[in-house]
């Protein structure tokens, strides 16, 4: 045995290396699977042991597929021989060793997962697991050649393909209609020009599913649809009706109440029979022909209705000034129908004669209505301006009514110049015991001065310049007509006279005791009255007073009581006092007392009338005392009533 430096390693035996966990030379390695227990508890059944082993195998295959450790040996010599290569359309090889190994592992894992689901229904396969692409298919032949009049394809597809989609959803299968007639004529096929799959076969429905149960279920529904289309007519096919209704709903043309059957409590109330009643005369609803208020256009009209309508139409046109006055207006049988006559008036006494007609041509127009150049006041000044012109002053009167006085030429309602004026336009007769008017007083003006310029046919009195217009007097207050122009005395009145005429009919009071002044020289106001009357009688007296003076001066007419040169004035009007003349004495003690107590009171004494302030003075306004006059009771006298026209003399002055 060699010792020392010449010793060889063979002389000393080598030591065995220590085993460590990092040593790669160890052949036995521990496999750790996450989620799997490393210690198996005792007392497991065989099914539990099998489930544990199958789950370990599934986890191992999943790990290999996920990491790509397919177990292919790196040495090509250790590999098995490869089959014939298969290439796709792009020139790539499909059956490589890696592809074949992965496919083999996936099939093995799929088998294990199917077994594990059978052992444990609560088992969940891995997230990357996909079942194999193997599918079960079947064909259902469509007898289109035997029944060409039936649209089987339409029944299977349905509106917008909804029927076919519903079957696929229920059976979890894929249904395709193939064969001859499945594609519409003119529709483009494949882009490469090749035939579609199954195009050369008869018309059929191809059903494909993952399981055979789903395929059988889909095939059964397709056969039921084909049988219903063959045995049931189209108008009685419920499936066809439902498809048409669904198509209308999709197109927006569905009527919900077409096939709706209402229950008794949902039905609407019955309509009223009145709404269904139709009139045979006018065609309206809601009434019968006997209750109809309208007449047919062809119904004959009575002569009385025609005459009444013609009369109303002519009256309307006459008021508008477009037609002559109807014949009934000019008749002398009764008073004319005018807007003024239509106003309500108090009834006249039965003893009074009826007023003459407005349009009568047998009598002449009274002279006081004829205006001439010899009068003191011209026509336009009397009426407050020319026709259509402005008023002449603050006391000017409005225009007369065209329908009564003919203010507008050519109007059908013009007054006849040869006939008498209407009753309210006639002047009152002069009193029996009074003299003529002074130059400043011309008596009551005609009624046409008091009527405003109103439209024709309106029948309404308007207010002119803030002054109330006076309507015509009542029939009971009408003054008697003027005396006739002949020499015969006027007839006595047949009716009751107004109070102021009754007072005039009384005999004049006895003259005062004779004295030198009374017998030789008259009083100042009497001198002025006599002189004025005499001078006015020559040419300044109004025409209507001239006519009365001529009638009084005729030899055949009896002389009136009193001064023959005096023309009587209306009651309540006295001539004005001359300038500088003393005022007349009071008529009595009672009159003096009433003057002191109420200066504006009414006294019917001739001397008291001279003290009444004129209308244009600063005295109290009497605008509201035009008509009717109030009754005034004085001591020792009867109640008197002033005539309605006495208030106008102050205005005219």
From Swiss-Prot:
Organism: Mus musculus
Modification(s) after translation: Phosphorylation on Ser-20 interferes with U2AF2 binding and spliceosome assembly.
Residues bearing PTM N-acetylalanine: 2
Start and end residues, zinc fingers (CCHC-type): 277-296
Pro residues bias spans: 418-447, 470-499, 567-584
Official protein name in the record: Splicing factor 1
Residue numbers bearing the Phosphoserine modification: 14, 20, 80, 82, 89
UniProt signal peptide: none
Bias type Low complexity, positions: 335-350, 515-534
Chain ranges for the short sequence motif Nuclear localization signal as given in the UniProt record: 15-19
Alphabetically ordered keywords of this record: Acetylation, Metal-binding, mRNA processing, mRNA splicing, Nucleus, Phosphoprotein, Repressor, RNA-binding, Spliceosome, Transcription, Transcription regulation, Zinc, Zinc-finger
Residues annotated as domain KH: 141-222
InterPro entries in alphabetical order: BBP-like, KH_1_KHDC4/BBP-like, KH_dom, KH_dom_type_1_sf, SF1-HH, SF1-HH_sf, Znf_CCHC
Region (Disordered): 1-44, 65-94, 325-584, 611-653
GO BP term, example: regulation of steroid biosynthetic process
GO MF term list: RNA binding; zinc ion binding
Segments of skewed composition (Gly residues): 382-394
One Pfam family hit: KH-I_KHDC4-BBP
The family this protein is said to belong to: Belongs to the BBP/SF1 family.
Tissue-wise expression: Detected at intermediate levels in spleen. Lower levels in heart, kidney, brain, liver, testis, bone marrow, adrenal gland, lymph nodes, pancreas and thymus.
